[in-house]
Every structure is written in structure tokens, then in C-alpha cells.
Design a protein with these regions (language model features):
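Divalent metal-binding segments
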Residues: 72-122, 161
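Metal-coordinating catalytic core of metallo-dependent amide/deamination hydrolases
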Residues: 115-192, 198
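Hydrophobic beta-strand scaffold residues
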Residues: 111, 137, 177, 220-221, ...
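Active-site-adjacent C-terminal substructures of enzyme catalytic domains
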Residues: 186-305
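Active-site gating loops and adjacent loop-to-helix segments of metal-dependent hydrolytic enzymes
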Residues: 59-94, 190-191, 217-223, 273-279
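Active-site microenvironment of metallo-dependent hydrolases
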Residues: 1-22, 26-30, 35-36, 98-105, ...
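Divalent metal-coordination and catalytic microenvironments
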Residues: 9, 24, 29, 42, ...
Length: 305
């Protein structure tokens, strides 16, 4: 049975978020028409968010008081988060992640890319958590989990000695590869770039030369600015060097990172970036709603999406 509905208002349409008065017709989850209208309700229609970097398993650690920086809280294998994950039963993990996914949906997020710890069992837990929910998960595993996931999410080329081999294997399998890079310093960015990733996360301390290389190689960068401040890897608007990235032509995406201390609310994330870094509202809104190019996902309001 065909399911069709329509919604009218002022919509931010296409790849450039052009504001148009339209009626949008959706058939079986696909936009089949975007029709110009003269009289529409006074409401705005915005493309859904895509959260381009999450660690949803951290949900189980949300209520635990924690202080410290990157190494103490989230660095593998002995950061607080990893100790908690190892002690958490799988069923508890699934239920916690499912609750967080529901919150993401309620705040306008239609997809996410998760770096999933815990090998194949960890990937399986997130697959179960997202099952039947109206959201598109891109799951990137590690420690063998990449073999049953959408690809690999590598913590750092500095820490994972066979990261280049993993990246090559993923490419041959037609899967996605993402790297944490440049979160605490610039030293692992070139190592990650040498592996020809589909995207990088953070690049908080990217140098001018590295920014130029990232732009030349057409590699998107996912910013997680609230997390950078929380983990004390930055203390000002120069890091990550967003304006330099924009000037160089780097494609910028937005993620919220670790759920244990950052709510996966994309509106809060882009509001922070707009305010703290002075990024124009339209630019950062586009970064948060364009979808996930590494997986070929577009969230633009246009026919066929």
C-alpha cells in the first residue's frame, strides 16, 4: 500500500538551502515533488540533521560524574569510557543506545555515523538498537567489527598500527573508512591521510599545510567542537581552524561525539559553532543537514531524496 503525504511552508530547498514557498509531496519515504505555492502556512521546513560523528555506547556512562581530559576519559584502551563499556551487559547497552537514538530522532536527526567499539559484538548491539527506528545508521566498527559494519572507524593512525591495511581492505570491500585525526595534536593527521580515508574527524590542530592537503584530496572533516572543549583539547576559536578550512574549500560536516558528556543534539552543536567560532548560520546549517557524503547520503529537500 502506497503511503503518501504532503507538507507546505517555506522550505530550505536544494543543495544551497534556497528558501522557497512550496508543497512537498512524499511517497513511500521519497520526495516525489517540490511544487511552488503562493499561499503557504507560516512554518519553516528544514532538511533533517545528519550527526556525522557519534559514540552512542557512551550512553551507559551519562550519569557518572567525570573529570579529566582525553586520555583519562575516552582514549582506548583504558579511558574511563572503555572500562565502563567492558563491564556493561550487551542488553543494557542496546537499551541505552536505543533511548539515545529516540532522543536524536525527536530533535530532528535522521541519520548518524557511529564509531562503534567492542568488535563484532559492539556492532551487533548498535544494529539491534537502531532496528525498526526511523533513522539511517552508518556503523563503523573496529577490532573486527568493521567486517560486519558499513566500514571502519579508526581511533587514530598513531594508535592503530595496521590502520593503512584496514583502510585498504575496506576500500576493496566497497566500505567506508573514517579516522580520528588531529584531536590532541597535529601529528597523526598525515598518517591518516596516507591511508586515503573517506573522512576525518576533528582535525582540531591541523596545520595550514595539512588543511591544504585535506582540501586538495577532497576529504570531508567532521567537527565536534563542544567535545573538543569538554576534553580540554582546545580553549579558543582558533582550534579547530574552521575559517581556514572554509577558505581552503574543505567540506565541513558536524558531529556531537561522546554521549557520556555531550547530548547528541545537533541544534545545540551548530548553535555553539555559530556563536563560539563565528561561522555564518547558513554555512553551519548546511554542514549539519547536507547528509553524509562519504556514504552517498543527501538530506537536501529535492525530488528523489
Amino acid at each position: 500500500m502506497v503511503k503518501e503525504y504532503s507538507v507546505s511552508g517555506t522550505a530550505l530547498t536544494g543543495e544551497d538551502l534556497e528558501a522557497r514557498d512550496v508543497t512537498i509531496i512524499v511517497t513511500d519515504g521519497i520526495i516525489t515533488a517540490v511544487e511552488e505555492e503562493k499561499n503557504v502556512p507560516e512554518q519553516w521546513i528544514c532538511p533533517a540533521f545528519f550527526n556525522a560523528h557519534t559514540h552512542l555506547a557512551d550512553t551507559v556512562a551519562m550519569d557518572i560524574p567525570c573529570t579529566g581530559g582525553l586520555e583519562e576519559l575516552v582514549a582506548p584502551p583504558n579511558g574511563l569510557k572503555h572500562k565502563i563499556l567492558r563491564q556493561t551487559p550487551k542488553n543494557d547497552l542496546v537499551l541505552a543506545m536505543r533511548d539515545t537514538i529516540a532522543e536524536m530522532i525527536n530533535s530532528g536527526t535522521a541519520g548518524f555515523a557511529d564509531f562503534r567499539e567492542g568488535g563484532s559484538e559492539g556492532v551487533s548491539a548498535l544494529q539491534q538498537a537502531a532496528a525498526s527506528l526511523p533513522i539511517h545508521p552508518v556503523i563503523l566498527g573496529r577490532e573486527g567489527g568493521e567486517n560486519i559494519a558499513d566500514g571502519a572507524g579508526i581511533s587514530s593512525a598513531r594508535d592503530v598500527k595496521d590502520s593503512a591495511e584496514i583502510a585498504g581492505r575496506m576500500r576493496r570491500a566497497g566500505k567506508i573508512v573514517g579516522f580520528h585525526a588531529g584531536e590532541r595534536d597535529f601529528e597523526d593527521i598525515d598518517l591518516a591521510l596516507d591511508a586515503a580515508p573517506d573522512f576525518l574527524v576533528h582535525c582540531t590542530h591541523a596545520t595550514d599545510r595539512q588543511i591544504r592537503r585535506i582540501a586538495d584530496e577532497g576529504i570531508p572533516v567532521v567537527l565536534c567542537c563542544r567535545s573538543n572543549f569538554q576534553l580540554q583539547v582546545t580553549f579558543g576559536s582558533s582550534n579547530p581552524p574552521i575559517k581556514k578550512m572554509q577558505a581552503a574549500g574543505v567540506q565541513i560536516l558536524v558531529g556531537t561525539d561522546n554521549v557520556m558528556f555531550i547530548q547528541p543534539d545537533m541544534m545545540h552543536e551548530i548553535s555553539f559553532i555559530h556563536t563560539a567560532y563565528g561561522v555564518p548560520a547558513q554555512d553551519i546549517l548546511y554542514s549539519a543537514t547536507c547528509g553524509f557524503p562519504p556514504a552517498g547520503l543527501s538530506h537536501a529537500i529535492k525530488q528523489g531524496n
